[in-house]
C-alpha cells in the first residue's frame, strides 16, 4: 500500500473513531483493536488487499473503538469467565450493526469487503461445508457474509440465537448471549460425547 494511502486511511480511522487513536500497519494475520492502548493495527499482507477489504477492516475495528467497553470486556473474560471466542463473535455482530447505523455509507463497504475476503478464502471455508462447522463458527460466517446473502442452515433453536444476535444493542446483551451460547454449546458437546459412549 502506498504511503499516502496508509496515511489517509489512518486519518480516516481517527475521524470515524472520533478520538485520536493510534493506527499502525504491521505484518500480522488480521486487524485488531487494543481497547486499553487505543491502538488499531492494520495488517500488511504479502498480497495487497483491496480498498474494500482495508475499509472493512478499519470500519470493523473502529466499531470496537466506539462501542466495546474496555472494563466490561475485561471483566466478562477475566471474572465472569465467558469464553473469549464466544464473546468476540457476538460482540463483532453487535459493533458492526452499530457502526453501520452510525455511518450508513459503510453498509456496502462491509458487504463488498467480506465478499472479497470470503472469495479469497480468508476464513478457510472454501473446501468445507459450513453447515458442518460448530455453531459459533456458523454464526460468525452468517453475520460476516451479510446474513441477507447467507444460506447457512440453522435449527429452530439456533435461529432464535441468530435473531437475538441481530437485535443486540448493549454490551450487557452480548455478555448474556455469549454466556448462554457457550453453555448451550458445551451441553451439546457433552450430549454428543455421551451418545458416542
Predicted segments, located by residue:
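Short, functionally important secondary-structure microenvironments
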Residues: 1-192
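A short, hydrophobic C-terminal helix/tail in secreted or cell-surface proteins
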Residues: 193-197
Amino acid at each position: 500500500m502506498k504511503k499516502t494511502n496508509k496515511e489517509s486511511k489512518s486519518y480516516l480511522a481517527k475521524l470515524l473513531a472520533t478520538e485520536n487513536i493510534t493506527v499502525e500497519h504491521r505484518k500480522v494475520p488480521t486487524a485488531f483493536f487494543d481497547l486499553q492502548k487505543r491502538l488499531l493495527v492494520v495488517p500488511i499482507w504479502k498480497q495487497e488487499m483491496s480498498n474494500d477489504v482495508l475499509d472493512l477492516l478499519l470500519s470493523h475495528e473502529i466499531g470496537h473503538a466506539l462501542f466495546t467497553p474496555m472494563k466490561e470486556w475485561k471483566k466478562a473474560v477475566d471474572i465472569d469467565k465467558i469464553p473469549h471466542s464466544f464473546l468476540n463473535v457476538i460482540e463483532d455482530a453487535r459493533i458492526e450493526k452499530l457502526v453501520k447505523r452510525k455511518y450508513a455509507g459503510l453498509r456496502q463497504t462491509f458487504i463488498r469487503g467480506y465478499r472479497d475476503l470470503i472469495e479469497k478464502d480468508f476464513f478457510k471455508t472454501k473446501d468445507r461445508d459450513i453447515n458442518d462447522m460448530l455453531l459459533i463458527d456458523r454464526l460468525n460466517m452468517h453475520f460476516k457474509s451479510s446474513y441477507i446473502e447467507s444460506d447457512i442452515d440453522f435449527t429452530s433453536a439456533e435461529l432464535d440465537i441468530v435473531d437475538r444476535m441481530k437485535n443486540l444493542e448493549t454490551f450487557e446483551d452480548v455478555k448474556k448471549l455469549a454466556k448462554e451460547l457457550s453453555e448451550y454449546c458445551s451441553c451439546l458437546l457433552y450430549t454428543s460425547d455421551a451418545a458416542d459412549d
